[in-house]
A protein has these predicted regions:
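Long, C-terminal-biased catalytic regions of enzyme "large/alpha" subunits
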Residues: 1-180
C-alpha cells in the first residue's frame, strides 16, 4: 500500500481548478446558449479517476463504511480545495457574473458541504486527510462569504472514458475495480 499524498493532491486540485477556470475563456462551445451559460456561471468539471483501485490498495471494501468514509474524505478535499481556489480567484478578479443573484443560496450550499465534511467518520480516514478536508471547507466558506466564488460549480464525478486509459487508470471514475 501507499500513503495518500494529501499535500500533493491539494496542490493538484488548486492548480487544476485555476487551469479549468482559464480554459473557460478559450473553450469552444457547441451552441451559443451553452457558451452564454458557461461564461455566466463559469462551471468547471474537476474530478478524479481510479477510486476503486485506491480503496482496493488501502484494503477497504468498496461497499463498506470504511470505503465510503475514505472516498468521502478524498472527495471532500478535492471539492473544498476547488471552491477555496475559486474564492481566491474571485478575490482577485471578481465572482462569476451570475453570482450576485445566487450568493445567498450558494453560500448555504457551501455551508452544507462544510458541515458534511465535518461529519465524515474519523475512525476510517487518516488524520491528515480528514483534517485537511475540514480545514479547506472552513476556508472555502470563509473566503466565499468575503469574496464570492469565481465558479458556480467546480467538480463532477463522472466516468473519465478513454482519457482514463491514457492515464493508466484501472477504473475510470468512482466504480469498483471489476477484477484483481
Amino acid at each position: 500500500g501507499f500513503s495518500f499524498d494529501t499535500q500533493g493532491f491539494s496542490h493538484a486540485c488548486r492548480l487544476w481548478t485555476l487551469t479549468l477556470e482559464i480554459a473557460v475563456l478559450m473553450a469552444q462551445f457547441p451552441s451559443r446558449q451553452i457558451a452564454l451559460l458557461s461564461h455566466t456561471y463559469r462551471t468547471l468539471g474537476l474530478g478524479y479517476a481510479n477510486l476503486g483501485v485506491l480503496l482496493m490498495d488501502r484494503g477497504l471494501p468498496y461497499d463498506s463504511e470504511a470505503g465510503r468514509a475514505y472516498a468521502a474524505a478524498v472527495t471532500a478535499l478535492m471539492h473544498g480545495e476547488a471552491y477555496a481556489q475559486s474564492a481566491r480567484v474571485a478575490a482577485a478578479i471578481g465572482p462569476f457574473p451570475g453570482h450576485a443573484r445566487n450568493a445567498e443560496p450558494m453560500l448555504r450550499v457551501i455551508d452544507k458541504h462544510r458541515q458534511h465534511a465535518h461529519m465524515i467518520d474519523a475512525s476510517y480516514v487518516p488524520k491528515d486527510l480528514l483534517r485537511s478536508a475540514h480545514d479547506v471547507w472552513d476556508e472555502a466558506y470563509t473566503l466565499g462569504a468575503q469574496h464570492g466564488y469565481r465558479n458556480s460549480q467546480v467538480t463532477v464525478l463522472a466516468p473519465t472514458g478513454t482519457i482514463g486509459f491514457m492515464m493508466d487508470c484501472d477504473t475510470t471514475g468512482i466504480e469498483p475495480d471489476i477484477a484483481l
